[in-house]
């Protein structure tokens, strides 16, 4: 079976064939200068139509033709009835061209593609191996991750999985803020308390989060401590830039608290099925940041204020607020080091993707402006902004210690998953340990799906019941896969040859049509940086399979050829579902 005759994207190939036929028909009768747009409606309201196009309606005025007559001419001249995969073409209403696909041929094409490509089905060569750096999560290492960080991590992780799947050379990075004021507060408190060890059984990020909260309270009560912390920060930066040995004790405190918090973050992210390829430290760019400041001063675009601080005016970029590059004592700020970090990334990748909270929009505008001043193309930085998650429990604040940690959130999800399983009678025959494992995977799938299915630019009003619903949430998708695997286990037979002509009932064909669109949804997710596109597709696919499962018998069919064809359809669904769930990071469960 040659790859040339087995398309990676059967639906798009079919659409292209139909569009070409329609364009050729129009060009053969009318003089049209430009490439004709042929919009396709994938959900036409006409009974019996799988696709439709209003192309005649949009062209009629330009060609001075009656739209219905134009549509009939297009159908007649294009011989759409003879186009491969099209069974019938006809005109309805004022000029809509409706198309019914040849179910047998289209089913054969789609299933051939799924079985030929297997675990690669859905993957298109969008990236052509080009190097990309994708940065996500990058939470301050001064306490545990909270659910907002979880949204960042899930969005970034799904985009990374999809970009790797579509042949981008992706390196996933976590930018570690190891020299900001918050870390200085934590390092100061750590030294003050005598460098305490993390108690056995306690996560390091939780322990240091408590220390940080205590430090914040002490500084709030005694504002003079602010200067002590500032001295800590200045000493650490001098250590990094000038290798000043007298600050080794302070530097060691900074590095210890950062590494310990980061260790806790990694544990949480692993549970959420999120991984990073590289951890890049802000402190690595302390010297580079100073060089950038000098360069901007030499270029005449930055200036030193009377108090000694260096600033750059961004009014030419429509930004009223000037950007401060250094403090009056000459030390750099996070923004300056972030500029250095992005220059470093751009030197190593075709383009960069950053996943950031919506509150970073001004900072990104400033970053783009300075990069443009430095003659770097800011369009090579693609930023995915996301809004916040609102929990029933209320707001989160790492500063005062009032927040819901991501660990607590995942534990709550697991507890509720166990309760849902018990209420639904799921996995009753299994041991407590096995049920715990299934509950954990249901919880992770539920949380990831609940985050993924909402467009990043919209806030999430988190609903526990909906997230863990076996009819709407992540478990709904896992259950579809488990049902399919159950059918194949019970059948206990290997089907090598089958006739797709036996898959012509409405429910089977709807499932086939839905599966044929998987590659296109992956591509849209990557191009638009929208995990919600893929998540919604996953829900629709699962819903279609559940309907098929309930309406179409597979195991108890007298006709062997029908049974074999339906078994292959179920097997094809497990391939698509597993590929899809892997991209979304949703655990696959063979039994539920």
UniProtKB/Swiss-Prot annotation:
It comes from the Archaea. GO terms for molecular function: arginine-tRNA ligase activity; ATP binding. Its EC number is 6.1.1.19. One of its GO terms (cellular component) is cytoplasm. Transmembrane segments: none annotated. GO terms for biological process: arginyl-tRNA aminoacylation. The keyword Metal-binding does not apply. Keywords: Aminoacyl-tRNA synthetase, ATP-binding, Cytoplasm, Ligase, Nucleotide-binding, Protein biosynthesis. A motif ('HIGH' region) lies at residues 139-149. It is found in: Cytoplasm. It catalyses: tRNA(Arg) + L-arginine + ATP = L-arginyl-tRNA(Arg) + AMP + diphosphate. The keyword Nucleotide-binding applies. InterPro entries: aa-tRNA-synth_I_CS, Arg-tRNA-ligase, Arg-tRNA-synth_N, Arg-tRNA-synth_N_sf, ArgRS_core, DALR_anticod-bd, Rossmann-like_a/b/a_fold, tRNAsynth_Ia_anticodon-bd. Belongs to the class-I aminoacyl-tRNA synthetase family. HAMAP family: Arg_tRNA_synth. This is Arginine--tRNA ligase. It comes from Methanopyrus kandleri (strain AV19 / DSM 6324 / JCM 9639 / NBRC 100938). The gene is argS.
């Amino acid at each position: 079976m040659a790859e040339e005759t087995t398309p990676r994207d059967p639906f798009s190939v079919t659409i292209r064939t139909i569009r070409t036929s329609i364009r050729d028909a129009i060009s053969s009768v009318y003089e049209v200068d430009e490439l004709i747009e042929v919009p396709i409606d994938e959900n036409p309201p006409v009974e019996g139509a799988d696709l439709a196009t209003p192309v005649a309606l949009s062209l009629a005025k330009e060609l001075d033709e009656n739209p219905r007559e134009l549509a009939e001419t297009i159908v007649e001249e294009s011989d759409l009835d003879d186009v491969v995969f099209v069974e019938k073409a006809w005109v309805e209403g004022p000029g809509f061209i409706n198309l019914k696909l040849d179910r047998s041929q289209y089913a054969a094409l789609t299933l051939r593609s799924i079985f030929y490509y297997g675990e690669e089905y859905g993957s298109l060569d969008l990236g052509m191996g080009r190097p990309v750096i994708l940065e996500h999560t990058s939470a301050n290492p001064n306490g545990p991750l909270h659910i907002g960080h979880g949204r960042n991590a899930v969005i970034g992780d799904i985009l990374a999985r999809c970009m790797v799947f579509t042949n981008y050379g992706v390196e996933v990075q976590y930018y570690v803020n190891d020299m900001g004021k918050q870390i200085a507060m934590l390092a100061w408190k750590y030294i003050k308390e005598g460098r305490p060890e993390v108690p056995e059984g306690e996560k390091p990020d939780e322990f240091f989060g408590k220390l940080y909260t205590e430090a914040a309270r002490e500084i709030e009560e005694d504002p003079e401590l602010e200067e002590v912390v500032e001295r800590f920060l200045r000493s650490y930066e001098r250590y990094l830039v000038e290798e000043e040995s007298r600050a080794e004790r302070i530097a060691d405190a900074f590095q210890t608290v950062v590494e310990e918090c980061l260790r806790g973050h990694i544990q949480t992210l692993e549970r959420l099925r999120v991984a990073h390829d590289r951890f890049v430290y802000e402190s690595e760019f302390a010297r580079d940041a100073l060089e950038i400041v000098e360069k901007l001063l030499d270029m005449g675009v930055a200036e030193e204020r009377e108090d000694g601080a260096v600033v750059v005016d961004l009014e030419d970029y429509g930004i009223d607020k000037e950007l401060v590059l250094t403090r009056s004592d000459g030390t750099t700020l996070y923004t300056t080091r972030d500029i250095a970090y992005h220059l470093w990334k751009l030197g190593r990748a075709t383009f960069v993707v950053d996943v950031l909270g919506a509150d970073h929009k001004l900072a990104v505008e400033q970053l783009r402006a300075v990069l443009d001043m430095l003659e770097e193309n800011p369009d090579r930085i693609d930023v995915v902004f996301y809004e916040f998650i609102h929990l029933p429990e209320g707001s989160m604040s790492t500063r005062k210690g009032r927040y819901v940690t991501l660990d607590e959130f995942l534990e709550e999800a697991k507890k509720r998953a166990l309760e849902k399983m018990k209420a639904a009678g799921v996995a009753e025959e299994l041991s407590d340990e096995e049920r715990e494992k299934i509950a954990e995977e249901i919880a992770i799938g539920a949380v990831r799906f609940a985050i993924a299915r909402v467009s990043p630019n919209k806030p999430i009003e988190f609903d526990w019941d909906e997230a863990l619903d076996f009819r709407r949430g992540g478990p709904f998708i896992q259950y579809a896969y488990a049902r399919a695997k159950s059918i194949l286990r019970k059948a206990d037979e290997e089907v090598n040859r089958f006739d797709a002509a036996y898959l012509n009932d409405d429910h089977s064909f709807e499932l086939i049509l839905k599966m044929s669109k998987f590659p296109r949804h992956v591509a849209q997710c990557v191009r638009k940086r929208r995990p919600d596109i893929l998540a919604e597709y996953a829900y629709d696919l699962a819903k279609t399979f559940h309907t098929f499962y309930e309406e179409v018998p597979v195991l108890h069919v007298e006709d062997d050829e029908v049974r074999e064809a339906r078994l292959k359809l179920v097997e094809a669904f497990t391939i698509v579902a597993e590929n899809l769930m892997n991209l979304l990071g949703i655990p696959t469960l063979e039994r539920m």
